[in-house]
Amino acid sequence: NDTLVSSFENKEDANNIILGKSKMALEFMQGIQLALDSLEKTGVSINLVVYDTRNDSSKVVEILQSRLLDSVDIIIGPIYSKNMKLISDRYGNDKKHTLISPLSKSSEFLKNNSSTIQLNTPYKNQVKIITEFIEEKYNDQNITICYEEPEKGLALYMQKNLSKSQNKISMMNMIYTHIDSIRTQFLDTQIIILPSNNRAFVSKMLGTLGGIDSSFIVFGLSNIKNYDHLDLENLMHLDVHFPDPYYFNSNNSNNSKDKVLLNNFEEKFMAIPSRFSVVAYNIMMNFCTKNQIYEFEKFRLNGGKVNINAPLVKYQDYSLEKVLE
């Protein structure tokens, strides 16, 4: 289900948030509530209104027809792309509104909608982050880009972005991923890149690579973080790197703002914030104050903006840590 949460700031901004009626939604709301407390302490007053859309497109249409959103400045959501498109079709080019997609990986709603923003860094932007890091840190390495045919375009984009480096780039269309069929092909490879959002393919490749007696650095996309069935020790063994637009380490936060968030959340809810709570909190603080948590660039000439603040991370000592640049 989707829930539309409208918040109206008395003085300047107004905000709307669409979230799922689930554990994720409750965690998201906790982040909003914590942000409201923080904003109130700075003199910013916000009234919150919730609309339950039940993840029903007809309910979203009903809300749009009611004109309830006409007077707000910022609309955050929906989570689901089909409903996000309905909202962006109405307000996507309205300069009086800013539309924010908090979690969806789909960028379709950004096209020709200049007032839209995507927080989940698109895969092409993640490719740029990975290739820039490799070009800066590695030279004269053997790099293999492994892909399946449906995602060949993203693999070729990765190859193109690496073409200016001094590394040796190989492309490998993976038809078989059994360890015995590919073991010898990786003996001289130092870096392996998996530019894929296919859960089954990435999982199988990581399992196969973990069984090869060789030393790798593996780069993947942010979706790896969502695959909770992966072996953490294997991820550490393979030194798996990936961009994370939602990075927050509650175990070891050296960022003073993150520490404030963590301490305040624990005091209010007697728990550690989930990533959904952190996302919600950061959205409110970024767009209702002058704190710049995200960094944006244009998606296309006449389109919206995407978040490019997605630091590279890796698992180290059983914890997700930022990669030192």
Model-flagged regions — what are they?
Residues 1-325:
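Extracytosolic ligand-binding ectodomains
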